[in-house]
Amino acid sequence: MSKDDSIEFEGSVSETLPNTTFRVKLENGYEIIAHISGRMRKNYIRILTGDRVKVEMTPYDLTKGRITYRMK
């Protein structure tokens, strides 16, 4: 799968789960489970409940995603 196959959505973090995993409510109303991308983990970017985030998802599993950006 290439990087072009991923789907990007915006949403807000509704709940913090263990192991840097979050429940994210997307703009279209769906809730998914998302983890932090490696680059965000490496740069110690903190994500809290209520933060606006950009989530990258694969078309094969639309219930899980990767948080790639935290909005300011």
UniProtKB/Swiss-Prot annotation:
The residue ranges crossing the membrane are none
Localization, UniProt = Cytoplasm
The record's InterPro entries line, in alphabetical order, gives: NA-bd_OB-fold, RNA-binding_domain_S1_IF1, S1_domain, TIF_IF1
For this record, the Gene Ontology CC terms, alphabetical, are:
cytosol
> What are the UniProt keywords, alphabetically?
Cytoplasm, Initiation factor, Protein biosynthesis, RNA-binding, rRNA-binding
Q: Name one GO molecular function term.
A: ribosome binding
Chief localisation class: cytoplasm
Q: Which stretches make up the S1-like domain?
A: 1-72
The record's HAMAP family line, in alphabetical order, gives: IF_1 (MF_00075)
Please give the family membership noted in the entry.
Answer: Belongs to the IF-1 family.
Q: How does it assemble?
A: Component of the 30S ribosomal translation pre-initiation complex which assembles on the 30S ribosome in the order IF-2 and IF-3, IF-1 and N-formylmethionyl-tRNA(fMet); mRNA recruitment can occur at any time during PIC assembly.
- Protein purpose: One of the essential components for the initiation of protein synthesis. Stabilizes the binding of IF-2 and IF-3 on the 30S subunit to which N-formylmethionyl-tRNA(fMet) subsequently binds. Helps modulate mRNA selection, yielding the 30S pre-initiation complex (PIC). Upon addition of the 50S ribosomal subunit IF-1, IF-2 and IF-3 are released leaving the mature 70S translation initiation complex.
Instruction: Specify the protein name.
Output: Translation initiation factor IF-1
Q: What is the lineage of its organism?
A: Bacteria, Pseudomonadati, Pseudomonadota, Gammaproteobacteria, Lysobacterales
Q: Which gene encodes it?
A: infA
